[in-house]
């Protein structure tokens, strides 16, 4: 792998920024005496703390005596267009054939003026094709509109012929076959419309018509019956609630008595009494048996 071109100077020891008038005088005087055969060694020989590339660009773009100032002429612009068509964006090669002009100036003029001018000229050259297309589109629209108008006129004439044929049907008995066909079509259309109306009427649901002006006695009777039903329902519900409440109260009282007897020990006394009664009954039976034996 090659290391490429070596740098022309040490960038840390070189002055940068805009040139001063003293530096311009040194560069001009040195080039007028010795020329510019080697731009790398020129800064050391002339005593300038500048890079060789900076000296070259300063001389070519600003300080050389044959440098032209001002706007480009029309001949120069035409030559730039032709050379750009041949060489492309090789600005230094184009500048070599235009004495007194730098490659930077030529590039700026191309991008700011000449390129836009060529684009506009090419657009104007392509413009004549667009009116033809617009004419064709307008013609197509006119044809469509005329076709629609013709169809509408035909329909209106058809309607007029139908009306005239129906009006003069009784007087002219020997009609043409075309008139007969038109009459038949008209009758079919009317019959179909009539059938549609009948079907719509049949499809409607049967709605009960309730008169608004009814007898007030009926409404009062309905109100009283509703109130009576509500009162009976309320009484039944209240009676059922009362019975259920009484039963629940009795159950609670019984439960309370049982609980009280269990706490006081009355249940055991009852059991003892039953045991004594059974013993007494058994003893009485034994006595009776003994008496029967003796």
UniProtKB/Swiss-Prot annotation:
Biased composition (Basic and acidic residues): 138-161
Region (Disordered) location: 117-177, 229-253, 266-288
Ranges in a coiled coil: none
Record's compositionally biased regions (Polar residues): 162-174, 229-242
Tissue expression notes: Expressed at low levels in stems, roots and siliques. Specifically expressed in fibers and vessels undergoing secondary wall thickening, especially in inflorescence stems.
Regulation: induction: Slightly induced by UV light. Triggered by salicylic acid and jasmonic acid. Regulated by the SND1 close homologs NST1, NST2, VND6, and VND7 and their downstream targets MYB46 and MYB83.
Effect of loss of the gene: Reduction in secondary wall thickening and lignin content.
InterPro entries: Homeodomain-like_sf, Myb_dom, Plant_SW-associated_TFs, SANT/Myb
Domain of life (superkingdom): Eukaryota
Residue ranges the UniProt entry marks as DNA-binding: 39-63, 91-114
Database matches in Gene3D superfamilies: Homeodomain-like
Biological process, per Gene Ontology: lignin biosynthetic process; positive regulation of DNA-templated transcription; regulation of secondary cell wall biogenesis; response to UV
This protein's GO CC annotations: nucleus
Keywords: Activator, DNA-binding, Lignin biosynthesis, Nucleus, Repeat, Transcription, Transcription regulation
GO molecular function: DNA-binding transcription factor activity; transcription cis-regulatory region binding
Keyword Transcription: yes
Domain HTH myb-type: 11-63, 64-118
Cellular location(s): Nucleus
Protein's job: Transcriptional activator that binds DNA to the AC cis-elements 5'-ACCTACC-3', 5'-ACCAACC-3' and 5'-ACCTAAC-3' of promoters and specifically activates lignin biosynthetic genes during secondary wall formation mediated by SND1.
Protein name per its UniProtKB record: Transcription factor MYB63
Organism name: Arabidopsis thaliana
Gene: MYB63
